[in-house]
Amino acid sequence: MKIASVEIIVLKSPGLYNNSDSAAEPEGPTYMGLAKITTDTGLIGWSDIETCAPVAKACVDAPKWSLEPGMECFDGLATLLIGENPLEVERLWYRMYRGSIYYGRRGVALQAISALDIALWDICGKAYGQPVHVLLGGKWRDRVRAYASTLFRGNPAAMTEAVQHYTAQGFTAVKFGWGGFGQNERRDLPLVEAAREALGPERDLLVDTGWFVERTPKEAIRLVDSIMPYKPYFVEELLHPENYDGYRQVAEAVRVPIACGEQEATDWGFQQLIERGGVDILQPDLTRCGGFTVGRKIVHMAERANRLVVPHSWSSDLLTAASLHLTAFQRRAEFVEFNTSQGPLSRELVKNPIQLEDGYLRVPTGPGLGVEVDEAVVEKYRIA
């Protein structure tokens, strides 16, 4: 079996990613990329990719730079995969990483590699007739508790209404993030207070403060201390992603677990988060960190360092399925993130959407990712 074609498909939603002062559900991603790898036997592997999709497409479609063996360093990612055996995921990951190293190593090139790696694992599962978690090494659980992942609303009443909406669906944990949070402490605290009161003491509240609001470590510490009375399970993304020493300063000063990592890439990057950053919870996004090939290494690294892993998963059911496989593979797992946005790129891409059951998501058991892409929907929203 050989790889016959590799492509990034660019999708556009008719709506715009937004948030307002109302309790209404945010629209979700405006643009999304899909990685599609087709083999000469007809097997197809898929992954979504939450990045600047046209740039990722350029990384994949770029030509081969040199015909000289061993000189791959500016090559388009497709040229590095076509004709190769898709089952050799570890070797192909490094082939893409080295072959793009002069324009890659991190950023959009690594994100494209991540999506292609997930698609290769999807092919492997379909070839062997096994779900990805079995190929990773095993399944420790059949289901994972999900938290509703959404944006901060603009006022306490809207926060209360939003929480009531999620708990009525069966969620036992809700994470609010971004939106207008972080601009004014006197405005922020009533939002967190409203969420906690609506959730009650038996459900979990998670807070994503949004690092786009630039803070010093001491400002971050003050923020965590201010919301600690509302018992957040964790506080996420307080500082710039590369501020490892600042994260250690915060993590050592507060009692609330500190989470970050959705912007991080490669196992080397997560080693920095553990050793320099000292964070409590790692949040690798499989479409950014390096795919399953790197995600498995992050899980092993976290287990050795006694850290939790809660993958970032905010796009479509494709990434949710991938994250469930990685979470099933962990010996200890607390949560999986569930993007509650109602836009078509979040909700319509697969024929068998992942459904909440009593606050949990079931780990897919079908071959590969265990979800089936609806190619009619892909064509409907495809722009490149």
Model regions and ranges:
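Structured beta-strand/loop patches that form or line metal/cofactor-binding pockets in enzymes
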Residues: M1-W46, E50, P54-K57, Q342-R347
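Flexible C-terminal active-site loop/helix
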Residues: M1-A4, I9-L11, G15, M32, ...
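Glycine-rich, aromatic-flanked loop segments that form ligand/cofactor-binding clefts
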Residues: V108, D117-R153
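Hydrophobic faces of well-ordered beta-strands that scaffold small-molecule active sites
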Residues: S47, A146-S149, T172-F176, L205-T209, ...
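Metal- or metallocofactor-binding catalytic centers and their adjacent structured scaffolds
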Residues: T38-A127
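Metal-dependent enolase-superfamily TIM-barrel catalytic cores that perform enediolate-based chemistry
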Residues: G137, D142-V254
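Shared catalytic-loop signature of beta/alpha-barrel
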Residues: D225, K231, E242-Y360
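Conserved, mostly hydrophobic/aromatic
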Residues: I3, G42, L77, L116, ...
